[in-house]
Amino acid sequence: MLLYRQTIEDFGLYAGAELSDAQMLALNTAASKMSAKMRAVRIVASSSVSKNDLEQRLIHKGETPMAAKEAVDWMSDMQLLDDRVTAEQIVHRCIAKGYGLARAKQALFEKRIPKEYWQDALADYPDQEDAIVQYLTAHRHDLAESRGMKRTIDALIRKGHSYHNIRRALEQMALDADDLLED
């Protein structure tokens, strides 16, 4: 059993100490809770996670559901875990990467952000037409042939841009993609 310093101090443990069955059970429970808390700290320090995502990751890593729930509550009480802030961070990263609205929603879903925070986080999502035009301009050499244009359009769709916005950007660039887009 791995014990953290705090647990050792809480139980007043020393080499050769004998514990009753009740004390051993309490020690195991405390060790499990502390393990979940420390693992939660490591996870939160390395990536943006929601409360649900953190709890599921802790359980997946071998923590008990009760210890995982208590660790998430502990992190929330210390204000180290906030789904609203996490949602805003995820949306900001999606905007920086040039993703469309659909891809941003997918990222929020993947991180298990509760839907009640989606609307606020996505409220200021900018129109992505400029990002689409920049992408099309950067891949202009691919647009000369129909196969290259289709690949470029498919890449934009994978980035979460809507068909309507891509078509508008193509029209803005004065490219006629009608034949290709109907495939």
Model-identified regions with their sequence ranges:
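An alpha-helical, amphipathic repeat domain used for nucleic-acid recognition
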Residues: 1-183
